[in-house]
Each structure stands twice: as C-alpha cells, then as structure tokens.
Amino acid sequence: MPDAVKVGFVLFATPARGTLIVFCDDGLKFGATATKALGAAVATVKRAAATAQFKGKSGSALDLLAPEGLKVGRLIVVGAGKAASINDYDLLKLGGAVAGKIGAGDTAVTVVADLPTGAMKPEQAAAIASGIRLRAYKFDRYKTKKKDDENGAANASVTLAVADPAAAKKAFTPDSHVVDGVILARELVNEPPNVLYPEEFAKRAAQLKKLGVEVQILDVKAMTQLKMGALLGVSQGSAHPGRTVIMRWNGGKKGEQPLAFVGKGVCFDTGGISIKPSASMEDMKGDMGGAACVVGLMHALAARKAKVNAVGAIGLVENMPDGNAQRPGDIVTSMSGQTIEIINTDAEGRLVLADVLWYVAQKHKPKFMVDLATLTGAIMVALGTEYAGLFSNNDQLAERLAAVGQSTGEKVWRMPLGPEYDKQIDSQFADMKNTGSRNGGSITAAQFLQRFVDGTPWAHLDIAGTAMASPKNEINQSWGSGYGVRLLNQLVAEYYEAKK
C-alpha cells in the first residue's frame, strides 16, 4: 500500500523526543495517562487553551511548543468533545485530526490513547489508528517536485500508548486490512485514464489472487459468447476493449449462497457520441468509482479472512466517440435477452451494469446483490455529496445498509422505486430505452437496473456525489474517497459473516 505512515502500539512511557499528542474533552479534562504524561505542565496547557480560546471541541487542536518539564519538542492537544458519548466513527475522525496535525518534521509521534472517561479499549485505539492511516493517505506518485511540507503524516512513525498493546494490535489487524481496501479503491479512482484503462484495471484486480481470491477475466470474445450486448455496445468505440472481472472469496461454508457486489467501471467517460461538455471532463476518470469500491472490498474481505462467501463483479469499459462508437437510435440486446434503445450514449453505466447484474444473478444465485455506480448527476442534485442514493427491492437489506451507513459515516438515503416511473423508459422500438426525462433521473436509472436482477434481493447505491471530488473531511484529503468499502465491509461483518 502506498501510505508510508507507520502505526504501532506500546505501553505508555514518557517520550524523550518528538511530538506528544493527548486528548481532552470539551471541559478541558484529560485522562489519567495524559495527566501523568503532562505532569506539572497541565496548568500551563490550560492557560494556553484559555488564551487561544481552545474549548476541546471534537477534532479541534491546540498546538504548542512543549512546556518546560516535557522532553518532547512539540505538544498537541486534540479535542474529543463529549467523551462520554464518543462512538467508533468519532474515534476514526479523531485519528484523522491527529494525522492532520502531524507535520513533515514529526518523524516520531506518541499519541496517548486515553480519555477522561478512562483508557481506550483496544477497539477504540484501533479506530484511532485507522483514522490516522486514512487521513495520511495522499496520491502524489506523478509529482516529480514535492514541497518539503507536503508529506505531513505520510512519513511519520506514530505510536499509540495503550493499556494493552497486544490486544490493540489484534483489534487493529482486521481494521488495517479494511483501510488497505479503502486505499486501494482511492488509488484506482485517482489514477489517470491513460494509465488505468480496462485491461490494466483487470490486471490490478487479478492481483487479489495473492490473497486467495479466485479471479476470472472475461474478454470481448467471452462476453460476445455470453451475449453481453449492452456492455459491449458501450465499449465498441474505444481502442481499449472492455473486460468483465469476476472475483470470488470463499471464506464461508462450502455451497453457501454468496453475497454479491457489482461495480460500474467506466474507466473514462466522454459521453460517447452524446459527448459531455469539456469543462471538468477530466473528472470522468473517476467514473469507475463503483468498480474501485468492489475491488477494495474484496481485498478487505480476503485479507481479514472474512467468514463468508462473496462475489465481486466489475464491468470495465471506456465510453469514447470513435467512428465505431454506439449511436443514439441503436438497439442492443442485453445478456438477459431484453432489448434496449439507446437514446443517450452518456447514459452508459446502466448498460454496463445491466449485463453484469444479470450474469451474477444467473451464474452465482447470490443471497443478495449490491451494485455501486457513479450513475447520475441527478442524485447529486437531490442529495449533494454527503449521502449516496439507496434504491432497493428489499426492505431488510435497505434497513441494514442504512444502519451501517450511520455507524461508518458512509451515509445512504433511501430513494423511491415504483412502476409509475417505468413509463419514462418505455420505448416505441425496443423493450426499453436507456434514459427517460430529466425528472427523477436517478430513480428511472434504478428502475432500469431493477429489470436485470431477476428477482434477487438487490440494492443500488448511486455514489456519483460521494466517490470522487467530494469535500475533504477528517479522514480523507484525497480526490478519490474510497466510499463504500467500509460501508459494505461493516454490512458483511455485522449481519452476514459467521461468528467465531
């Protein structure tokens, strides 16, 4: 993984160098270990806090030259807010706040993992460590000249002082694999499209074999034999042929129905013949955020040896305006046998998903399918960049996704489905058309997808506002967010994974 920050756990011992970080609540109270670490400097710190009007608000920080009596060079006090009601996502954000204060010169950092309410539990310390890693990630491999202050926490060695280092490390191990999955998803979204085209994306997904994931790559010949006309129609205008990648993790009981996750992977989307405006078209390298999430999730499940059977499937294409490109007015036949009239070639993601969803439903008979796609601008109009749109034909699955969305901070908002919307995608010439009117655009897109799930319990996550170019936050300073990896990992762990 590209992040170089090192995070470890030790019993507390007063650090003799580097940077010391402690937490306080919104009453400027410290935990017992932090109080011990500060010693006589507590009074000095509180005077400095009063002068700076530092109140201990969650995520805020007071940065000081270490007071007399401390051997470290720098002291940072990070506010934990109302410590008595802190949850795992709050702790993740606190870890991000810690990483955000680490500078390029902070090579040795000690974080005292306690609160006024007591020493952090192993799982809480692990959440802090995960937040540090998530915030420290940055994508700069193509920069040949880097400023000295750009690295921040990326090259730091961070030690968390905890009550039980072995237990904290044990708790952090699976969490760290999930962070790896998030970072992998971010890497894929951030890559330029001349580097990450369908064949290259497929090769990177195939690297999951090292973790025990079975990987099958369907090329154009194989997809033609399967009659994936909807997906192939999108890719026919590109010099880079399309691919479908099927990833299988068999961590559950033999023969048990798998869980299925499907991702839209448009590696670059010009809009095709219905070409997009040039302004911000460069952002369309991220139109494969759904596929990136699925690869990151499969990495997380395999690396932490999840006790579940899971299938990840991604359809990879480029949507280009070549002389061979698909035209408005074309009619394609999907793998399901249903015909689709192309009205707008820029409504291509649903065509890709149509064939991959049908393939997974037919070949793997999953317990449920969740697809992720940067599908519509309409969902951004409706929900902005804080929530993904959730559409589902199954109330239990939708409720579970909403619950883990709240606990992980990767929030979803359920949107309606209904046959009343189908008339917008009725076609005079085919079974359906690939887009309706502007009204309810994200809903009609989901109605379209529902025609290809063959009755399987299914949820569609429209992540157009959350996967890329979303506002930076406490745990992500990257253009690509890796949205969905933590959400779906938690869904699996909480509701479907065999308990030890």
Swiss-Prot record:
GO terms for cellular component: cytoplasm. It is found in: Cytoplasm. Its cofactor is Mn(2+). HAMAP family: Cytosol_peptidase_M17 (MF_00181). The keyword Transport does not apply. Mn(2+) 1 binds at residues 269, 346, 348. Keywords: Aminopeptidase, Cytoplasm, Hydrolase, Manganese, Metal-binding, Protease. Belongs to the peptidase M17 family. It is an enzyme of class 3 (hydrolase). Mn(2+) 2 binds at residues 264, 269, 287, 348. It catalyses: Release of an N-terminal amino acid, Xaa-|-Yaa-, in which Xaa is preferably Leu, but may be other amino acids including Pro although not Arg or Lys, and Yaa may be Pro. Amino acid amides and methyl esters are also readily hydrolyzed, but rates on arylamides are exceedingly low; Release of an N-terminal amino acid, preferentially leucine, but not glutamic or aspartic acids. One of its GO terms (molecular function) is manganese ion binding. InterPro entries: Leucine_aapep/pepB, Macro_dom-like, Peptidase_M17_C, Peptidase_M17_leu_NH2_pept, Peptidase_M17_N. It comes from the Bacteria. The active site is at 276, 350. This is Probable cytosol aminopeptidase. Its EC number is 3.4.11.1, 3.4.11.10. Binds 2 manganese ions per subunit. GO terms for biological process: proteolysis. Presumably involved in the processing and regular turnover of intracellular proteins. Catalyzes the removal of unsubstituted N-terminal amino acids from various peptides. Pfam families: Peptidase_M17, Peptidase_M17_N. NCBIfam families: PRK00913.1-2, PRK00913.1-4, PRK00913.2-2, PRK00913.2-4, PRK00913.3-5.
